[in-house]
Structure formats: C-alpha cells, structure tokens
C-alpha cells in the first residue's frame, strides 16, 4: 500500500542535510547513505548518491524519472546466479 499523499514524502534528515550541502557547494562526489527508505525528491536531481545494499555502496545517478521512488529500489540487495544446471546435460 503506497504512502498517503497528505503525509508527504519521507526523507531522513541526515540525508537531506547532506544533499543540501552537496547542492550548495556544487560538489560532484557521491553522497554516501544507508537510508534506502528515503524518497527521491527534486533537490536530488543530478546528484550521485551511493546507496548501501548490505555489502557495498552502489552509485545511483538521480534523474527526473526517479522522483517519487525510494533509493533502495535502485540498489539491488540480492545477486541471482541462475538455477542449477542439469549435470547429465552438462557432460555431453
């Protein structure tokens, strides 16, 4: 169930401060964050945000189409390596 519109977007305060500081200074270094739950807002457009996926920080370049989505959607946490192959078919 999506978040109610009357509540507005959620963004962690520490991330908001980092984003405002990066926009103000014009810094192009990625903004590191562990806050996967924060929503992407228009202030973040053009920034690279390094989102933690549980093992490392995945760089995410924010574009207009991403507004309203959560940061965690763009940093996958699981790696899919495929199903186990049939051993008999492999030998041939």
Curated annotation (Swiss-Prot):
Keyword Ribonucleoprotein: yes
Molecular-function annotations in GO: rRNA binding; structural constituent of ribosome
Superkingdom as given in the UniProt entry: Bacteria
A single GO BP: translation
InterPro entries found in the cross-reference section: Ribosomal_uS19 (IPR002222), Ribosomal_uS19_bac-type (IPR005732), Ribosomal_uS19_CS (IPR020934), Ribosomal_uS19_SF (IPR023575)
Entry's transmembrane regions: none
UniProt entry keywords in alphabetical sequence: Ribonucleoprotein, Ribosomal protein, RNA-binding, rRNA-binding
Entry's Gene Ontology cellular component terms: cytoplasm; small ribosomal subunit
Presence of the UniProt keyword Ribonucleoprotein in the record: yes
PANTHER family given in the database record: RIBOSOMAL PROTEIN S19P FAMILY MEMBER, SMALL RIBOSOMAL SUBUNIT PROTEIN US19M
Role: Protein S19 forms a complex with S13 that binds strongly to the 16S ribosomal RNA.
Annotated family: Belongs to the universal ribosomal protein uS19 family.
Protein name stated in the entry: Small ribosomal subunit protein uS19
Organism: Aeromonas hydrophila subsp. hydrophila (strain ATCC 7966 / DSM 30187 / BCRC 13018 / CCUG 14551 / JCM 1027 / KCTC 2358 / NCIMB 9240 / NCTC 8049)
